């Protein structure tokens, strides 16, 4: 991601943030290429943040047609029906993001994310997936891992006032300050498939309840053939039945996953804007950190619940 020096125009535009993270980090940002799929409220916040930060390019992939329901959860889509009739979410968001920072190349890609070949992902440094099934997350993550270069992979899922971020940086090297020294560090990340298949019983008792709840909801949607977020309160009895089966299969108490938490996740499919802003901000910060190579990255799950206002990082792998 290193390249030529910043132009005079870039230096002037990004002057304030260059003072924070340095010209080298800004140069790496300006040469980076980010793919974003599934643009709902949280992902829209993320896109705004990285475009304002000055990444080189953002490619948007979301072929859903814009509807009233869609624009209610996405501030990049203005509530003007005449402006979005017949247009996709990616097309409308692309136009809005260009206005935020004309120096960032924002484009769209059409197609089904799950059917794109491995070579498609080679042109990107970062891949961010929102609003996707468990199977799609696994498949795209595996394709990114099969590339000759390391591609930073993220998933984000916000349901009501709760959210989850997953991170896979494969083998990642970075620097951090330790007293007066700059220390080189390295982290090894598990894949999405590895991270969501960790046995529950050996996990620390303090592990975020949202981790387990998200696994139940994802599996329910997959087995029922639902799209992400296509749950309602009427599904709760079957969701609770699946929870019971998963807890028994993992030899843990059903108290691992409070019923009230699952009820919140299935009954509120509209993203809570303040939660979107916080989770999208954290995700943007992490991507900027990884592109710049400065600072310790999040490993490998982040959870936020607006009900208690707490953010929790969980490092989960088979090496527990």
Swiss-Prot record:
InterPro entries: ThiF/MoeB/HesA, ThiF_NAD_FAD-bd, Ubiquitin-activating_enz, UBQ/SUMO-activ_enz_E1-like
SUPFAM superfamilies referenced in this protein's UniProt entry, alphabetically: Activating enzymes of the ubiquitin-like proteins (SSF69572)
GO MF term list: SUMO activating enzyme activity
GO CC annotations, alphabetized: nucleus
GO BP, sorted A to Z: protein sumoylation
Key words of the record: Acetylation, Ligase, Nucleus, Ubl conjugation pathway
Pathway: Protein modification; protein sumoylation
CDD domains the UniProt entry points to: Aos1_SUMO (cd01492)
Tree of life domain: Eukaryota
Database matches in Pfam families: ThiF
UniProt subcellular location: Nucleus
Coiled-coil ranges from the UniProt annotation: none
Keyword Membrane set for record: no
Presence of keyword Phosphoprotein: no
Chief site of localization: nucleus
Similarity annotation: Belongs to the ubiquitin-activating E1 family.
Described function: The dimeric enzyme acts as an E1 ligase for SUMO1 and SUMO2. It mediates ATP-dependent activation of SUMO proteins and formation of a thioester with a conserved cysteine residue on SAE2. Functionally redundant with its paralog SAE1A.
Subunit structure: Heterodimer of SAE1A or SAE1B and SAE2. The complex binds SUMO proteins via SAE2.
The name this protein goes by in its record: SUMO-activating enzyme subunit 1B-1
């Amino acid at each position: 991601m290193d390249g030529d020096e910043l132009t005079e125009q870039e230096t002037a535009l990004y002057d304030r943030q260059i003072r924070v993270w340095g010209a080298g980090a800004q140069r790496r940002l300006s040469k980076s290429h980010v793919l974003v799929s599934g643009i709902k409220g949280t992902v829209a916040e993320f896109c705004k943040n990285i475009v304002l930060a000055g990444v080189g390019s953002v490619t948007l992939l979301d072929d859903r047609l814009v509807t009233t329901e869609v624009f209610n959860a996405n501030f990049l889509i203005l509530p003007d029906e005449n402006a979005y009739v017949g247009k996709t979410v990616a097309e409308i968001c692309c136009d809005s993001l260009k206005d935020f920072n004309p120096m960032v190349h924002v484009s769209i890609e059409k197609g089904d994310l799950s059917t794109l070949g491995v070579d498609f992902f080679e042109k990107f440094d970062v891949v961010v997936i929102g609003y996707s099934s468990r199977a799609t997350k696994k498949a795209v993550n595996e394709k990114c891992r099969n590339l000759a270069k390391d591609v930073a992979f993220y998933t984000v899922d916000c349901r009501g006032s709760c959210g989850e971020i997953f991170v896979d940086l494969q083998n990642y090297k970075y620097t951090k300050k330790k007293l007066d020294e700059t220390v080189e560090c390295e982290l090894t990340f598990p894949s999405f498939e590895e991270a969501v298949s960790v046995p529950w019983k050996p996990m620390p008792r303090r592990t975020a309840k949202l981790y387990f709840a998200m696994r139940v909801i994802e599996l329910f949607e997959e087995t029922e053939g639902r799209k992400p977020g296509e749950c309602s309160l009427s599904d709760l009895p079957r969701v609770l039945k699946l929870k019971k089966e998963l807890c028994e299969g993992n030899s843990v108490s059903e108290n691992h996953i409070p019923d009230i938490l699952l009820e919140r996740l299935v009954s509120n499919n509209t993203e809570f804007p303040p939660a979107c802003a916080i989770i999208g901000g954290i995700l943007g910060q992490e991507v900027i950190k990884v592109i710049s190579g400065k600072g310790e990255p999040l490993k490998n799950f982040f959870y936020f619940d607006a009900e208690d206002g707490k953010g929790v990082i969980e490092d989960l792998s088979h090496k527990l």
